[in-house]
Amino acid sequence: MRKKECIAMLLAGGQGSRLGCLTRNIPKPAVSFAGKYRIIDFSLSNCSNSNIDTVGVLTQYKPFALNTYINMGSAWDLNCLNGGIHILPPFVGEAQGSWYKGTANAIYQNMDFINFYNPEYILILSGDHIYQMDYYEMLSCHKQKHAEVTLSAIAVPWEEASRFGVMVTDAGGRIIRFEEKPPRPESNLASMGVYIFNWDVLKEALLEDERDPQSDHDFGKNVLPRLLQQGRRLYSYLFHGYWRDVGTIESYYNANMEVLQEERVDKFFELKQRVFSNEEILAPQHLGERAKIHNSLIGNGCTILGEVRDSVIASGVYVGEGSLIEQSILLPNSEIYEDVRLHKTILGENAIVRAHCRIGDKREGNPPQEGITVIGDHLHIPEGTVISEGENVRKDTA
């Protein structure tokens, strides 16, 4: 038994079905973001920068790419001997074991791992948000208020509040009510999916939840409301920084485009600590004689022979002569051949678009700013193909 004050459990097994074909072969935390990162980089970097050196990463859906990317955790300085990073897939033991049935059940199935370190506090994280937070400051607040559970919270627009777990607090920040994704929210204070529990409180709550046959075994739906009913001390930790939930195609696209906006980019990059990634070491970008770049982010290892405008281009991408890329996101190692027009499109990893294609063509009658075209990873789009805006292409086109 190795005593740790606080360890982190990072939930990274979600399929991310709302991201469509972007998560056909990989889980949501492994999806590329802003040209050089994976979504999970932000939570792992937060742990490293907050001196939390023991992290359990709970994987489930198609985990190979994520496991390979994380490796031993050295990119985030989490390859230490006493602690470090641990990949925790579902397993079958003598008395228990199955696929994770919910966020709470995922932690329940790994109680032996937690008990090995015998922590006083447990930090529960989601691996699919873009933000930077000092978890140590949150833990200090948790201690000062003698809280049993602390939830990080952020004010969101009222029209978006129903997408989140929302809380009502008193003047001191103590949570009075909590409801997961209410149809008519009474607050716009949203849970960020970052929790600190006293381990003894969480252990008891998980055991009780597992005994309930009616439970969905979910923190937001079951565990937190039950703790409130029991009169436990739940507090909010108000976060004022940059935070984005990128769980839908629209939110993922918009968050990437924000990196290019002058009024947003300063806030995104005013990070107090570095965001680490396990990015492959590649040569610098190569720009051809006729290449034109305007307000775009170009990753390492790219070859750009055409024109790129208002776009995020990840590492290892090829754009051929005479091609025009506008308001698009090209994920790692994708290829665009000659004379291609790509508009407001997300092109998956290792996808290939042959010459003379027109992708994201405007449909008559659609309002402006609608219709993000998505091409799945490893797909081949034949020469001369026309794909209208808003289509979600999951398999090779004939």
UniProtKB/Swiss-Prot annotation:
UniProt binding sites for alpha-D-glucose 1-phosphate: 100, 165, 180-181, 191
Keywords from the UniProt entry: ATP-binding, Carbohydrate metabolism, Glycogen biosynthesis, Glycogen metabolism, Nucleotide-binding, Nucleotidyltransferase, Transferase
Gene3D superfamilies xref list: Hexapeptide repeat proteins (2.160.10.10), Spore Coat Polysaccharide Biosynthesis Protein SpsA, Chain A (3.90.550.10)
GO molecular function: ATP binding; glucose-1-phosphate adenylyltransferase activity
Superkingdom in the source lineage: Bacteria
Gene Ontology biological process: glycogen biosynthetic process
Signal peptide residue numbers: none
Pathway connected to this protein: Glycan biosynthesis; glycogen biosynthesis
The protein's Enzyme Commission number: 2.7.7.27
Catalytic reaction list: alpha-D-glucose 1-phosphate + ATP + H(+) = ADP-alpha-D-glucose + diphosphate
Protein role: Involved in the biosynthesis of ADP-glucose, a building block required for the elongation reactions to produce glycogen. Catalyzes the reaction between ATP and alpha-D-glucose 1-phosphate (G1P) to produce pyrophosphate and ADP-Glc.
PANTHER family referenced in this protein's UniProt entry, alphabetically: GLUCOSE-1-PHOSPHATE ADENYLYLTRANSFERASE, GLUCOSE-1-PHOSPHATE ADENYLYLTRANSFERASE-RELATED
Oligomeric and partner information: Homotetramer.
Family: Belongs to the bacterial/plant glucose-1-phosphate adenylyltransferase family.
Protein's recorded name: Glucose-1-phosphate adenylyltransferase
Organism whose genome encodes this protein: Desulfitobacterium hafniense (strain DSM 10664 / DCB-2)
Gene designation: glgC
